[in-house]
């Protein structure tokens, strides 16, 4: 396993795919990083030289990734919650934020079903 910016990336994969193991770097950003660093995206991680690793590190360090990105996302959610925004309220209640229905569905966000027993009807 090679390390880039403190993250272990797999040796056997193409560098274009391996960079996506870093939080905040998807396929398109990984392609942009490799283009700026002048590295062939089809090259395997195990075949990279130390100079190429340094070039990738220099280009990738300009982006907000891993801990910094996670911190920024958490602060944005906290800010929404503090100002009393609807989205902040939905985040606090662990419900869908973007207007999806919740009467049915939304099970991922709400968690497993909590069944409620029916009230028995008294017979006369």
Swiss-Prot record:
PROSITE patterns hit by this protein: RIBOSOMAL_S13_1, RIBOSOMAL_S13_2
InterPro entries: Rbsml_uS13_C (IPR027437), Ribosomal_uS13 (IPR001892), Ribosomal_uS13-like_H2TH (IPR010979), Ribosomal_uS13_bac-type (IPR019980), Ribosomal_uS13_CS (IPR018269)
Molecular function (Gene Ontology), one example: rRNA binding
One GO CC term, this protein: cytosol
Pfam annotation, one family: Ribosomal_S13
Coiled coil: none
Region (Disordered): 94-124
Organism: Mycoplasma pneumoniae (strain ATCC 29342 / M129 / Subtype 1) (Mycoplasmoides pneumoniae)
Role, per record: Located at the top of the head of the 30S subunit, it contacts several helices of the 16S rRNA. In the 70S ribosome it contacts the 23S rRNA (bridge B1a) and protein L5 of the 50S subunit (bridge B1b), connecting the 2 subunits; these bridges are implicated in subunit movement. Contacts the tRNAs in the A and P-sites.
Listed name of the protein: Small ribosomal subunit protein uS13
Keyword annotations: Ribonucleoprotein, Ribosomal protein, RNA-binding, rRNA-binding, tRNA-binding
